[in-house]
Amino acid sequence: MSLDTLITHNTLLPATPDAQPDACALVLMGGGARTAYQVGVLKAIAAMIVAQLPGKPSPASPPPAFPFQWLFGTSAGALNACYLASQAVHGLDALPRLATFWSALRSERVYRLEAPGWVRANRIVAGLTLARQVRRHRALLDTLPLVDTLHRAIDLDALERALAQRIIHVLGVTASSYTTGEHWTFCQTRPSHPVQPWHRPGRRAEFQPITIEHLMASSAIPFLFPAVPLWVDGHKEHFGDSGE
């Protein structure tokens, strides 16, 4: 997914004539470690915004406004984008809240490998155990812990409120269809947004409510995490990490 693609298809155009002409877009790439670095940068941006405020804000004063109106992400970057969108109703506090979320994240809240420690001592047994894991979960790792983590962390109702209140305009999540090989950008806007789905060689865009399934599809690393079925064009296709 590129910013040029989003601009070309008018995804970043203001939804209404009275929308802010200087609104900002945030496009977040994937990659676990890189995504953690993104959190640090965003936390620093929040601190710089606060430092530029006139006077010293009191603890009782409301936080500054959320600084981004268009959020797009792929893979782990999509998780960050969606989390921020769901926290946008809290203004600038959304950025340090994302850092708090990452600080509490542990591997057991992301995946589960059903193999006792003693299995590693025998290559044959380890191979058989991993093969059983693949048959059961369609991948090496069980990602149900991540599903639970995202359901607990991301308030999709708050995301809809942020869109309805025009705090944000668009949330976009990209994923690759293993069925067709096309890259999809799933976008959620408020109902009055005029942008229509678009299609160009190898790339599609669909406007529909973002769900945890979209996030799991975008972050489904091939072979490690299972592909996720999503409904597109009236049928199911299996999606995974777009690698973009």
Predicted regions and their residues:
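Small-residue-rich anion-binding loops in enzyme active sites
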Residues: M1-V27, Y178-P194
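Surface-exposed acidic, glycine-flexible loop patches that form ligand/cofactor-binding
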Residues: L13-D18, P59-A65, L156-Q165
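Acidic-glycine-rich active-site phosphate/pyrophosphate-binding loop
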Residues: P14-D18, P54-S58, A220-I221, V228
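Patatin-like phospholipase
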Residues: Q20-A25, A33-L144, L150, C187-R200, ...
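Extracytoplasmic "Venus flytrap"
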Residues: G30
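Active-site periphery "cap/insert" segments of enzyme catalytic domains
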Residues: H137-A175, E182-F186
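Active-site gating loop/helix substructures
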Residues: A164-E244
